[in-house]
A protein has these predicted regions:
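An amphipathic, hydrophobic-aromatic interaction surface with interspersed Lys/Arg
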Residues: 1-257
C-alpha cells in the first residue's frame, strides 16, 4: 500500500507503507551501518529527486502514520513521550535557499543537499541540484551512485569555493532544533545540522522502536489469537499495537470471568 501527503513546501510525496516485517529488516540494517540503515529508510520514499530536508519531513510523517505519533525521550523522570508534531512544529518550514551560479558556461543550481552525510565527503557536491551546459540539463538527485561520481569528477575546481560560500551564507538554514530545552523534565535541547552525520543518525534513532526479540515475542503472543502470520507481519506496527491491546484487554476479561 502507498500513502501520499503534502509537505510544508506544498510538494506532494508518495511513500510505501512501512510494515511490521520491515521493522525486523530495519533492525538488521540499524545494527550494521548508518549507510545501510538510512538507505533502507529512503527506499520507502517513492517520490524522486527530493533533497534531504524533504526526505526528513517525509520520513517523520511516515513514522507517525505507520509506527506512532510519539517517541520516547530520556529525562530525569524517565522516558517521556514526545509528539512528532511537536518536533515538526519546532522545525517549522525550511526557507527556499536555491541559488543559481555560472562557472565556465556551466549553470549550477545550489540547494539543500540530496544526499545525507554518512561519512562520504562527496555528499557535499549534492548541494548542486542541477547542472546545465548548452542545452543539456542534469538533475543530480536522479543520478545513480556511479553517474554521480562521474559527473562531480568533471566539475571545474572552482566549484569548491562556490560551495563553501553557499554553506557559510546559509549556515542558519542548515541548523534545526528538534527539541527545545525543558528544565522541569531535564530534557536537553537537541539541535541538528543537516550537513552533519548526526542528522541521518537522528532519523534512524526515531525508527528504532522494536528489537528482534520483541518482534518475535509480539508475533508469538498474537499468533494465539490471529493464526494468519502473514496478516500480522503485513500490518503496520501501529496496527500491531492495537491488536496487542485488544488481545490483552480480552485476556484480562476472560481471567476475571
Amino acid at each position: 500500500m502507498e500513502l501520499s501527503f503534502r509537505l510544508p513546501n506544498k510538494k506532494e510525496v508518495l511513500v510505501k507503507e512501512l510494515l511490521f516485517k520491515d521493522l525486523r529488516n530495519f533492525s538488521l540494517y540499524r545494527d550494521s551501518t548508518l549507510t545501510g540503515a538510512i538507505k533502507f529508510l529512503e527506499s520507502f520514499i517513492c517520490t524522486k529527486n527530493l533533497n534531504i530536508v524533504e526526505k526528513f519531513l517525509t520520513l517523520l510523517i511516515l513514522r507517525e502514520k505507520c509506527i506512532g505519533e510519539k517517541i520516547g525521550v530520556n529525562s530525569k523522570k524517565g522516558i517521556v513521550n514526545i509528539d512528532l508534531e511537536y518536533i515538526r512544529n519546532n522545525i517549522g518550514t525550511f526557507e527556499d535557499i536555491r541559488e543559481e551560479i555560472t562557472i565556465d558556461n556551466i549553470k549550477c543550481v545550489l540547494n539543500y543537499p540530496s544526499k545525507f552525510n554518512i561519512g562520504d565527503t562527496d555528499f557535499v557536491f549534492s548541494l548542486i541540484e542541477s547542472i546545465e551546459l548548452e542545452e543539456e540539463k542534469i538533475l543530480i538527485p536522479s543520478l545513480s551512485d556511479d553517474e554521480y561520481k562521474a559527473v562531480i569528477n568533471k566539475l571545474p575546481k572552482e566549484i569548491y569555493s562556490y560551495l563553501e560560500q553557499f554553506i557559510n551564507k546559509n549556515k542558519v538554514h542548515f541548523e534545526v532544533t528538534a527539541f527545545k530545552k525543558r528544565e522541569k523534565l531535564d530534557i536537553k535541547k537537541i539541535e541538528l545540522n543537516v550537513l552533519n552525520s548526526s542528522f541521518p543518525s537522528f532519523i534512524v534513532h526515531i525508527f528504532n522502536c522494536i528489537t528482534d526479540v520483541e518482534y518475535r515475542e509480539l508475533l508469538f503472543v498474537l499468533c494465539k489469537r490471529v493464526v494468519d502470520v502473514s496478516f500480522l507481519i503485513n500490518s503496520t506496527y501501529l496496527e500491531i499495537q492495537d491488536f496487542y491491546k485488544l488481545y490483552s484487554d480480552e485476556t484480562i476479561k476472560e481471567n476475571e470471568s
